């Protein structure tokens, strides 16, 4: 059966069978359409259609025989997909953990930065008050006439 399959259903033989009607058509045109050549051309065209149909039927038969193997393939494919989904879940979890960690670090750095900014403003305000109190003349603010001011 394999020999017949290789002989009649190979791409090489189909290519040769496809060229025969064209060659016979040229011969028919040169011989003014002999009935024998027309009959041979018809037989070859029918044989070609039969071979193509047979090849299709054999292909369908092979597919039907492989359905038992196909169930195993479906289970293997399902397991493979589930394995990939588990791996993906691990990667996504790691990604979210990394994002969460980065977010927490950023929040901590922001709060530290704000605290330092507040401290700097407070120290600046204290320094301004000290400078302002040092510049103030006690005689101008008290309204008292003391020996120091005179």
Swiss-Prot record:
Lumenal topological segments: 1-15
Localization in the cell: Host rough endoplasmic reticulum membrane; Host membrane, Host caveola; Secreted
Main location group: host cell
Post-translational modifications: The N-glycosyl content is primarily Man(9)GlcNAc, with a small amount of Man(8)GlcNAc.
Entry annotated with the keyword Cell wall biogenesis/degradation: no
Domain of life: Viruses
GO MF entries: channel activity; toxin activity
Topological domains annotated Cytoplasmic: 31-150
HAMAP family xref list: ROTA_NSP4
Function: Plays an essential role in the virus replication cycle by acting as a viroporin. Creates a pore in the host endoplasmic reticulum and as a consequence releases Ca(2+) in the cytoplasm of infected cell. In turn, high levels of cytoplasmic calcium trigger membrane trafficking and transport of viral ER-associated proteins to viroplasms, sites of viral genome replication and immature particle assembly. The secreted form acts as an enterotoxin that causes phospholipase C-dependent elevation of the intracellular calcium concentration in host intestinal mucosa cells. Increased concentration of intracellular calcium disrupts the cytoskeleton and the tight junctions, raising the paracellular permeability. Potentiates chloride ion secretion through a calcium ion-dependent signaling pathway, inducing age-dependent diarrhea.
Known partners and oligomeric status: Homotetramer. Interacts with the immature particle in the viroplasm. Interacts with host CAV1, early and late in infection. Interacts with host integrin ITGA1/ITGB1 heterodimer. Interacts with host integrin ITGA2/ITGB1 heterodimer. Interaction with microtubules blocks trafficking to the Golgi apparatus.
Family: Belongs to the rotavirus NSP4 family.
Protein name: Non-structural glycoprotein 4
Phylogenetic placement of the source organism: Viruses, Riboviria, Orthornavirae, Duplornaviricota, Resentoviricetes
């Amino acid at each position: 059966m394999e020999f017949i399959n290789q002989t009649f259903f190979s791409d090489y033989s189909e290519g040769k069978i496809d060229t025969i009607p064209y060659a016979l058509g040229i011969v028919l045109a040169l011989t003014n359409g002999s009935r024998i050549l027309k009959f041979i051309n018809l037989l070859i065209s029918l044989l070609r259609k039969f071979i193509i149909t047979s090849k299709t039927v054999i292909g369908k038969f092979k597919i039907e025989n492989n359905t038992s193997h196909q169930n195993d393939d479906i289970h293997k494919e399902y397991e493979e997909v589930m394995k990939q989904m588990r791996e993906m879940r691990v990667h996504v979890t790691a990604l979210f953990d990394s994002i969460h960690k980065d977010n927490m670090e950023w929040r901590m750095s922001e709060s530290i930065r704000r605290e330092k900014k507040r401290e700097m403003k407070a120290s600046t305000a204290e320094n301004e008050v000290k400078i302002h109190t040092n510049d103030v003349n006690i005689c101008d603010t008290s309204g008292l006439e003391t020996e120091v001011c005179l």
